[in-house]
């Protein structure tokens, strides 16, 4: 348990989250599990899914740097504040793409992102989710824990990624 907690804190750092983020998510999830009356097996799976939800987060770091010409930590941290509106997305991209590059290179990056943005976002999320699920299985966690980690970015309404589950 202490080892998993330490790993969870390390995942918070690699995802650009404040220390204890996954632990807080886990606490909230366990409160919901109590209210829902989940059995002990389901609670165990939920507990580890939430503590380790970001297992795959470092798998897309190099790709973020390659695509956006920026460091992945500030990119991931700051993207959490984007609400999805076009204005916020454009502002975010202008602030984070090619930060230390010349205008021409930054413009090239932005143009590619505008053209291929949805595909690139799917690629990044799919890589993260698949890698996280694989790591969970490699660590000996159940298929349910791996599936929960794989579904990290799914939304209740079907608008999430990588599969658009509802």
List the predicted regions and their residue ranges.
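Histidine- and acidic-residue-rich, metal-dependent catalytic cores
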Residues: 1-166
């Amino acid at each position: 348990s202490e080892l998993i907690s330490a790993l969870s804190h390390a995942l918070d750092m690699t995802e650009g989250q404040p220390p204890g983020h996954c632990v807080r998510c886990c606490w909230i999830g366990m409160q919901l599990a109590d209210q829902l009356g989940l059995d002990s097996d389901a609670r165990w799976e939920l507990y580890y899914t939430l503590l380790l939800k970001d297992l795959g987060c470092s798998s897309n770091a190099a790709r973020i740097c390659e695509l956006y010409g920026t460091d992945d930590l500030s990119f991931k941290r700051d993207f959490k504040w984007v609400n999805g509106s076009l204005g916020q997305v454009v502002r975010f991209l202008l602030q984070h793409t090619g930060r230390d590059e010349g205008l021409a290179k930054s413009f090239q990056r932005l143009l590619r992102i505008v053209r291929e943005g949805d595909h690139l976002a799917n690629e990044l999320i799919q890589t993260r989710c698949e890698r996280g699920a694989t790591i969970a299985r490699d660590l000996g966690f159940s298929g349910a824990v791996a599936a929960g980690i794989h579904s990290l970015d799914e939304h209740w309404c079907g608008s999430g990624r990588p599969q658009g589950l509802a």
